Regions:
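Divalent-metal-activated hydrolytic enzyme cores
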Residues: 1-21, 29-33, 37-54, 61-70, ...
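Short, well-ordered beta-to-alpha junction loops that form the rim of enzyme active sites
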Residues: 76
Length: 105
């Protein structure tokens, strides 16, 4: 069993956002660690229910093994895996919240 308080970040693999996002999550949600689940353009994949088995399994591990009680879903500007407008990223992230909430892992 892992020690400390965990959160889960479902985010793009882009290295420009991972450290700043983990820092923001730690500072704003008082967690010690952030499990990072990454794929290129992950906000689009989840919104479109595309190749979700691996993502769902990893979220389940974070929740069950690390007792994560917070899942943060993100997208970002200039994403090579999902080059869409900010508005589209926001729309996809809103869908992602519904999809991930339905998993009950």
């Amino acid at each position: 069993m892992a020690e400390g308080k965990f959160a889960t970040s479902v985010t793009c693999m882009d290295g420009r956002i991972q450290l700043p996002l983990a820092k923001w999550i730690k500072e704003n949600y008082s967690v010690d660690y952030v499990d990072a689940i990454t794929e290129p353009g992950i906000d689009k994949k989840v919104a479109e229910n595309n190749e979700l088995d691996s993502i769902k399994t990893k979220v389940g591990i974070s929740i069950n093994a690390h007792k994560s009680q917070l899942i943060v879903v993100s997208g970002h500007y200039d994403c090579a895996g999902n080059p869409v407008s900010d508005e589209e990223h926001i729309s996809q992230i809103k869908k992602d919240v519904d999809v991930i909430s339905s998993w009950n892992t």
